[in-house]
Amino acid sequence: MAIALALKVFAGLLAAALAALLLEHYGLTGPSSSLPQPRNPQRPHPAPGPGDSNIFWGLQISDIHVSRFRDPSRAVDLEKFCSETIDIIQPALVLATGDLTDAKTKEQLGSRQQEVEWQTYQSILKKTRVMEKTKWLDIKGNHDAYNIPSLESVKNYYRKYSAVHRDGSFHYVHNTPFGNYSFISVDATQNPGPKRPFNFFGILDEKQMKELLLLAKESKESNHTIWFGHFTTSTILSPSPGIRSIMSSATAYLCGHLHTLGGLMPILHTRHFQGTLELEVGDWKDNRRYRIFAFDHDLFSFEDLIFGNWPVILITNPKSLLYSCDKHEPLERILHSTHIRVLAFSLSSITSVTIKIDGVNLGQAIHLSGPIFILKWNPRNYSNGTHNIEAIVQDSAGRSTSVHHIFSVQENIHLTFNPLASFILLTDHCMVVQKFARKLPRIQENPLLTRLLAYERRIQLRKSQMEEMPRQVMRVGCEFPCFPQTHATFPTPPCIHQPGKLSELLQLGFLWRFYYVGMIV
């Protein structure tokens, strides 16, 4: 029976993945004129050349998890990042995409907002004066919303200690002499904020979706729009037409949340059917990951990095074929460009930037200004098929790093993303977990799974964790058809009054864990 159940679970996951991909491809509601459409990129000029204009860069950091009880080096390294790394790279802006604090109890089983963690986070920002050096845009993650009964609660420390100081999604415009670039945040944290593990998924209701649609329309005249949030789109519950449709005019959606799935998926990148890139960045908490991104003549490039590794290199022209999209970018500019362009940063001065294409040494790039290095080239020499470009950078202290990627100046050539990464980022995991929950009585007929569920319940009840859940309102549903339209007030969680019956939320909390472990094995 257990084997049959396992096969059914696997078949259900496979069917859900195929259904999600088909729905992603064909959509549920068809084209909608009310949704912002991808802009027609200007082409083919200005093309990347010998000038130092038409370029800016930024950073993303996510899942910092400043902790009162664990790994003080997270905060120590964050302070170094805000001083040393920021001073060297000098980004135009930094996107801190959620889980700024850990918000766990000492034994790590429960959750609680720890004000000292927020004070530590804010003190780092103030001590390093990072908000004077760059635009620091920090947003909430699920950990930052644990145990918060309402946004007006004194426990909502995000309002008091963050750089942004306000809840909800927002639109930031980076103005340059060569155009405007929009950055739209997606706040899908739950309100009220339940305890762990019930806070894994994000939720957007109808009102929030309308607000995001307005922000998308505001950005339609910008050169590019980047959306950023904590949750992957696959872990956000949203009403029709869905969050991916709302952000379809964006070049990319930058997020965190999944922590490289415990190191099993260090690269979680994919592309929505509408062309928007979804780029999850690894966590700062355990892996000290961060990301550099740039717009060079409206061509978007990025590189995922490990803190403390120098030199940092980003090839901005020619850009990577895998992350190219003619719906959002003027890719013809690569063919009309006159120079290969590289950003290079290090603790010591850069002494050499060597460029190779298909293993052939093209020579040393020359320093233009700041971190920009250029090398004259003729892209028409590479007009057929795909090619590999490599940049090797060395500094005066002897540090050396190389990066490479596949590029093409030919149209209608595409590369595909890792299928497992696409499955993780494009499948509607909320729907899958909900279907598991609906079939839970059948699952409980299995003695092994019944014991596992009971064990999970004992863990959640340990040290009266459930009694600490916000008591004013516990939302067990949402305002759109993915869940029943149910809002209930519980003076004490129902599973405490009814020990023999698992609450729906407890079922979901267990099942998403079971589901994710089963998915990646």
Segments predicted by a language model, with ranges:
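Acidic, histidine-bearing metal-coordination/catalytic regions of metal-dependent phosphoesterases
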Residues: 1-93, 126-128, 132-135, 310-521
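Extended active-site neighborhood of metal-dependent phosphoesterases/phosphodiesterases
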Residues: 25-50, 106-223, 238-252, 258-305
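Residue-level marker for buried hydrophobic side chains located in beta-strands
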Residues: 58-60, 94-96, 138, 227, ...
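Active-site glycine-centered loops adjacent to acidic/histidine catalytic or metal-binding residues
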Residues: 63, 98-99, 141-142, 230, ...
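A short, flexible beta-alpha/helix-coil linker loop
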Residues: 64-67, 100-103, 189-193, 234
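Acidic-and-aromatic substrate-binding clefts and catalytic sites of carbohydrate-active enzymes
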Residues: 67-75, 111-112, 233-237
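Short acidic, glycine-rich surface-loop motifs adjacent to enzyme active sites
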Residues: 97, 216-235
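Post-signal peptide N-terminal segment of secreted/secretory-pathway proteins
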Residues: 97, 105-106
